[in-house]
Amino acid sequence: MDLEIKKDITSNWFKMLQEAIWHTITNLERKDADIKTTVWNRSKKRDEGGGEFRILENGRIFDKVGVNFSKVHGKFPKQFLKNILGAKKAPSFWASGISVVMHMKNPMIPAMHFNTRYICTTQDWFGGGMDVTPSIKDDKEKKEFHKTLKKMCDQHNKKYYTKYKKWCDEYFYLPHRKEPRGIGGIFFDYKKDNFEKDFKFVRDVGITFQFIFEKIIRKKMKKKWTKKHKELQFIKRGRYTEFNLLYDRGTKFGLQTGGNVEGILMSLPPLAKWK
């Protein structure tokens, strides 16, 4: 398949998924919340693409949720060439993707994160994943979450779940705290064996995330909570913030390559505490 066609169909999918996820979010919220939509460009001087991020805050369900779509192209700074697949031969790149971060009002509902992307240098590949970060322990929910992920992964390859779960556990870990960020999920990168099969898997990851977050929210949105629960949520958000600013590759890469700062930092919670 021609590379330009691959770029078109992947970016179209990510944009369509943004619309679908946003539709579900606003249907769940069903009240006046603060909504901000920002269309951004990577460069003010040149055509290097851009994207659109949407943020909903101060809602009935969501304290803050961000859904970002991007389609950008340009050249990597020299310091990145050694670390990015295919960039040594030529610094040019093209990338498109979607990222979602949800911070909930009810501390009984976990924070949730998802992203998928397609990147082209002299090589092309998919990456992404999803993970859940509860403030209040719920073993049953954890079991159901991983069962759903395993079922989805097994439809593509029986080895995917174990491999991508391990990758997620290793990635979403705070070394200075010696603790995981949450209950894990799946994480994958440099997926480039077969475009058609890999793209189908990436689409299923997005569809599964939409199913999972809506199911969890609808199940828990009316659960009662206390100030103690909220304090635990604020502390957990502090850990979330530490990870995103200290270790998250996407955050560091975006800030170091001139990405949209507000879009990059949309993952941060609206309020957090440290003890």
Each language-model region and where it sits:
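Long, charged, mostly alpha-helical binding arms that flank functional sites
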Residues: 152-201, 215-218
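Compact, glycine/acidic-enriched structural inserts
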Residues: 122-166
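A long amphipathic alpha-helix within ATP-dependent nucleotide-binding catalytic cores
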Residues: 92-94, 148, 152, 156, ...
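A generic structural motif
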Residues: 6, 104-106, 122, 132-139, ...
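Long, contiguous binding/interaction regions
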Residues: 104, 251-275
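Internal mixed beta-strand/loop scaffold within catalytic domains of large alpha/beta enzymes
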Residues: 51-128
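Gly/Pro-rich turn-and-neighbor structural signature
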Residues: 2-85, 191-246
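Glycine-rich, often proline-containing surface loops adjacent to acidic residues and nearby aromatics
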Residues: 94-96, 125-133, 179-193, 240-242
